[in-house]
C-alpha cells in the first residue's frame, strides 16, 4: 500500500544497513575509550540510531531530544522549538547528534550552538542523509552516510505528515501526495 505513494526507491534497507555499519566502525575508532553521548533527534532518528547502535563497539550513552522546525509541512518553518530536552548533563561530554536528515541546517546549528554554550567537550553531527542543496545556514555534518538530491524523501524514519517512517527503505514521495 505505502509503496504505491513512492516514485522511486533511492536506498534499500540493505544499502542503509551497509552504510550504517561503516559509520559504526568509524565512530568506534574515533571514540574508543571516550564514552560519548549519542543524542537522537526524535522522531526521525529512531530507525537510524537503533541500527547504528548495533555497529558501535565501544561504550556509549544515549539520550533523546524532540526538536521541531517543520510543524507538519514539507518545508522548514525556520523556527526551532525544543519540545523535549536531554536528561543528561552534557558539560564536559563528547556529544554526537544523530539525525535522519540535514536539510536547511537550522535545527542542527541551533543544537550545536546550544550544546557548546552548555560546555560540551565536543559536539559532532552524524546523519543518515545530507541534503546540501537545502542548506540555509553554515553547518556541515561530521559523519554522513549519503548525500542526497533536493527531493522529498520518506522512509527509515523520514516522514511526511507523520507517515511513511515505517518503510524499511528510503524513497522519493510522489509529488501528488504532498501537493494535495
Curated annotation (Swiss-Prot):
Keywords: Cytoplasm, Glycosyltransferase, Magnesium, Metal-binding, Nucleotide-binding, Purine salvage, Transferase
Top-level lineage group: Bacteria
UniProt cross-references to Pfam families, sorted A to Z: Pribosyltran
Subcellular location: Cytoplasm
Spans traversing the lipid bilayer: none
UniProt: diphosphate binding residues: 43-44, 165
InterPro entries: HGPRT, Hxn_phspho_trans, PRibTrfase_dom, PRTase-like
UniProt key word Cytoplasm: yes
Binding site for Mg(2+): 99-100
Catalytic activity: IMP + diphosphate = hypoxanthine + 5-phospho-alpha-D-ribose 1-diphosphate; GMP + diphosphate = guanine + 5-phospho-alpha-D-ribose 1-diphosphate
Biological processes, Gene Ontology terms: GMP salvage; guanine salvage; hypoxanthine metabolic process; IMP salvage; purine ribonucleoside salvage
Chief location bin: cytoplasm
Pathway given in the UniProt record: Purine metabolism; IMP biosynthesis via salvage pathway; IMP from hypoxanthine: step 1/1; Purine metabolism; GMP biosynthesis via salvage pathway; GMP from guanine: step 1/1
SUPFAM superfamilies linked: PRTase-like (SSF53271)
EC identifiers of the protein: 2.4.2.8
GO cellular component: cytosol
GO MF annotations, alphabetized: guanine phosphoribosyltransferase activity; hypoxanthine phosphoribosyltransferase activity; magnesium ion binding; nucleotide binding
Residues engaged in binding GMP: 131, 152-153, 159
CC cofactor: Mg(2+)
Catalytic residues in the record: 103
Its job: Purine salvage pathway enzyme that catalyzes the transfer of the ribosyl-5-phosphate group from 5-phospho-alpha-D-ribose 1-diphosphate (PRPP) to the N9 position of the 6-oxopurines hypoxanthine and guanine to form the corresponding ribonucleotides IMP (inosine 5'-monophosphate) and GMP (guanosine 5'-monophosphate), with the release of PPi.
Family: Belongs to the purine/pyrimidine phosphoribosyltransferase family.
Xref: PANTHER family: HYPOXANTHINE PHOSPHORIBOSYLTRANSFERASE, HYPOXANTHINE-GUANINE PHOSPHORIBOSYLTRANSFERASE
Protein name: Hypoxanthine-guanine phosphoribosyltransferase
Species per Swiss-Prot/TrEMBL record: Streptococcus agalactiae serotype V (strain ATCC BAA-611 / 2603 V/R)
Record lineage: Bacteria, Bacillati, Bacillota, Bacilli, Lactobacillales
Amino acid at each position: 500500500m505505502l509503496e504505491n505513494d513512492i516514485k522511486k526507491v533511492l536506498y534499500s534497507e540493505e544499502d542503509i544497513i551497509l552504510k550504517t555499519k561503516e559509520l559504526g566502525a568509524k565512530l568506534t575508532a574515533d571514540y574508543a575509550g571516550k564514552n560519548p553521548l549519542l543524542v537522537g533527534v526524535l522522531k526521525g532518528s529512531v530507525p537510524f540510531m537503533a541500527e547504528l547502535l548495533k555497529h558501535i563497539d565501544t561504550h556509549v550513552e544515549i539520550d533523546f531530544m524532540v526538536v521541531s522546525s517543520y510543524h507538519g509541512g514539507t518545508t522548514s518553518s525556520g523556527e526551532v522549538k525544543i519540545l523535549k530536552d536531554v536528561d543528561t548533563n552534557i558539560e564536559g561530554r563528547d556529544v554526537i547528534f544523530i539525525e535522519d536528515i540535514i536539510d536547511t541546517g537550522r535545527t542542527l546549528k541551533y543544537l550545536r550552538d546550544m550544546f557548546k554554550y552548555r560546555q560540551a567537550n565536543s559536539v559532532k553531527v552524524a546523519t543518515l542523509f545530507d541534503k546540501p542543496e537545502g542548506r540555509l545556514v553554515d553547518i556541515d555534518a561530521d559523519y554522513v552516510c549519503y548525500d542526497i538530491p533536493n527531493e522529498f524523501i520518506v522512509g527509515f524514519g523520514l516522514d511526511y505528515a507523520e507517515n511513511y517512517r515505517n518503510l524499511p527503505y528510503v524513497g522519493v514521495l510522489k509529488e501528488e501526495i504532498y501537493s494535495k
